[in-house]
């Protein structure tokens, strides 16, 4: 059975799989069987039911895996290919999110708008260090879940149109899009899934003059640790990370 975008995002159907079709980089529609794979603690997901994440297995290309995020700001996808094929992405192309672009991982996107790809790389690098510190093994066959305290600078929030906590959903939607892709990599390579903690939005900031992160970027590690210790508490998360709009994280 095929369902449209509204059906896929229906929280009442989140425990069931659904078959959807999305275009690949060659312009051919491919089918995937998808199911919900939230990046949020259940309490956080309950607060933001309109922001969701899904995983899917390929039906047209049996070896492919889909990661899909959805919010009122639109959808983003990442398709993992096997046999050395490049991964593929779908992202909004137009400002109003009515036009989307499909591209392969090795292609330079040129005129496409700013995307979270840089954030993906930064998050992966930071988490890889933490994973190594914790001695997590990738080959034991058990999917592990860790609690992520994700903070963002005011500049990051402002980039996505959020200038106050009333617009927190704009920021969380952007973070969710990055987390969806990053979790795809970690689930595939390390059997590891990261869930945003319930109060991660407490360390989202909106005013550059008052947020706790100052330049140079080399200050951020210590400032992030101090912020998470003060606001979140060290017993309440496993990994802490920061997004900034200037290329740091």
Kindly give the residue locations of the regions a language model identified.
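Propeptide (latency) domains of metzincin metalloproteases
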Residues: 2-154, 186, 193
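Fold-level signature of zinc-dependent metallopeptidase catalytic domains
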Residues: 96-249
């Amino acid at each position: 059975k095929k369902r449209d975008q509204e059906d896929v995002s229906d929280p009442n159907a989140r425990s069931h799989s659904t078959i959807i079709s999305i275009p690949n980089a060659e312009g051919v529609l491919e089918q995937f069987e998808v199911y919900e794979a939230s990046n949020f603690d259940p309490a956080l997901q309950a607060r933001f039911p309109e922001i969701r994440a899904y995983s899917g297995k390929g039906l047209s290309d049996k070896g492919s895996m889909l990661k899909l995020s959805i919010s009122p700001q639109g959808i983003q996808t990442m398709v993992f290919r096997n046999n050395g094929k490049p991964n593929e992405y779908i992202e909004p192309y137009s400002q109003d999110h009515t036009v989307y672009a499909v591209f392969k991982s090795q292609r330079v996107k040129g005129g496409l708008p700013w995307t979270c790809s840089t954030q993906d790389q930064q998050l992966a690098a930071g988490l890889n260090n933490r994973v190594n510190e914790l001695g997590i093994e990738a080959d034991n066959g058990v999917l592990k879940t860790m609690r992520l305290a994700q903070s963002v600078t005011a500049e990051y929030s402002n980039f996505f149109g959020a200038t106050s906590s009333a617009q927190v959903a704009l920021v969380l939607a952007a973070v969710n899009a990055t987390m969806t892709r990053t979790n795809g990599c970690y689930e595939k390579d390390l059997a590891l899934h990261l869930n945003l903690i319930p109060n991660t939005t407490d360390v989202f900031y909106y005013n550059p003059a008052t947020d706790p992160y100052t330049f140079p970027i080399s200050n951020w590690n210590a400032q992030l640790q101090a912020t998470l210790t003060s606001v979140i508490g060290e017993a309440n998360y496993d990994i802490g990370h920061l997004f900034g709009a200037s290329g740091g994280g």
